């Protein structure tokens, strides 16, 4: 359950207008955020991903590049995100019997956190997987009845103040 105070929302002015938070007076701090999510796929699609049998190419390698690129460009797609110096991105895929799980860990040293970057990496990485396998996932009507992105969230967020 969130413990934030609704009266303390920082992305709006007193008049309700959107604004970017001023982080200029905050000290540079080492920060890390980890996010993850799942993409449910048919068993036959999972087998093709494992066997590098998708015609578009290596699914996980392409998704890894997409996830990393998304992390680096988060500030361009989420209006109130600051452009932050990304110092590291780790992507980990776990191909299970019925899903691909993606975990993205992002590190920065700066004045604001990197959880939005981690989330952007997860969602884009999973979207890339979906794009790569969509021909295998479509049913006879061109729909995706069993394909779904789920469980996207921030797993951990860390801040290490300088000593």
UniProtKB/Swiss-Prot annotation:
It comes from the Archaea. Gene3D superfamilies: Molybdopterin cofactor biosynthesis C (MoaC) domain. Catalyzes the conversion of (8S)-3',8-cyclo-7,8-dihydroguanosine 5'-triphosphate to cyclic pyranopterin monophosphate (cPMP). Homohexamer; trimer of dimers. The active site is at residue 131. GO terms for molecular function: cyclic pyranopterin monophosphate synthase activity. Pathway: Cofactor biosynthesis; molybdopterin biosynthesis. The keyword Cytoplasm does not apply. This is Probable cyclic pyranopterin monophosphate synthase. Pfam families: MoaC. GO terms for biological process: Mo-molybdopterin cofactor biosynthetic process. Transmembrane segments: none annotated. Residues 1-23 are annotated as: Disordered. Substrate binds at residues 80-82, 116-117. Belongs to the MoaC family. It catalyses: (8S)-3',8-cyclo-7,8-dihydroguanosine 5'-triphosphate = cyclic pyranopterin phosphate + diphosphate. Keywords: Lyase, Molybdenum cofactor biosynthesis. Its EC number is 4.6.1.17.
């Amino acid at each position: 359950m969130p413990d934030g105070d609704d009266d303390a929302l920082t992305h709006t002015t007193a008049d309700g207008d959107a604004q970017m938070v001023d982080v200029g007076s905050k000290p540079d701090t080492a920060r890390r955020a980890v996010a993850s999510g799942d993409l449910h796929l048919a068993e036959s699609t999972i087998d093709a991903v494992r066997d590098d049998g998708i015609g578009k190419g290596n699914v996980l390698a392409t998704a890894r590049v997409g996830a990393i690129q998304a992390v680096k460009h988060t500030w361009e797609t989420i209006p109130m995100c600051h452009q932050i110096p990304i110092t590291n991105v780790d992507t980990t895929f776990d191909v299970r019997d019925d899903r691909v799980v993606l975990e993205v860990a992002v590190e920065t040293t700066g004045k604001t956190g990197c959880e939005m970057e981690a989330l952007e990496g997860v969602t884009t990485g999973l979207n890339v997987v979906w794009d790569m396998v969509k021909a295998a996932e479509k049913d006879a009507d061109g729909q995706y009845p069993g394909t779904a992105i789920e469980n996207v969230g921030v797993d951990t967020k860390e801040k290490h103040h300088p000593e």
